[in-house]
Amino acid sequence: MADESPRKIQSLETAHRITEALQELDGAGASAIADRLDIGRSTAYQYLMTLREEGYVTKREQTYHIGLKYLDHGMYARDNHPMIEISRPSLRDLVDETGEIGWCTSEDNGKLVTLDIIEGDRNLNTKFRGRIGNREYMNAHAGGKAILSGYSDSRIMEIIDAHGMPSYTEQTITDEEALLAEIERVRERGVAFNDEEAMEG
């Protein structure tokens, strides 16, 4: 019987790792990418040249950066996500009523992704605004805990096993049993809270 387990395409994986490294490093040269990914400099250069020719990487002076072609794909994915159309009227009403900032988030492969942000009149603290497309850990955000409350405990554990439970502040829940207990409280209350778990203040 043939092996039907999924197999990774190494070259595609390397290309993705390079784009992720460019974002994490806020731009880099071929040598820095090679060191970061532990690949040959010539290999890194070939990938960067190919990505540049396809429009996914741009070069400014001697530094490569992620190209704006990714923005086209990202905006398409966001605008066609069903949550955008469903949530925006309610999100707008909530922001108008409270004057605070409102986020629409969704789980994607075990991470919490920001799909939409609407700012209210009272939101003066810029550090809380975030960015559309941000990918965060589920355990440290009210939105993440709210989403997890709709999942089975086994699915929650799968996400924890895959991504871990990193600490952002002293208040971040990093214990599995404590997180499951908090999620059970969210189920009972019907609402999740963030008690300085993602950032202080």
Task: Report the location of each language-model feature.
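Short loop->beta-strand "edge-of-pocket" segments that line small-molecule binding or catalytic clefts
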Residues: 166-168
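N-terminal helix-turn-helix
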Residues: 1-84
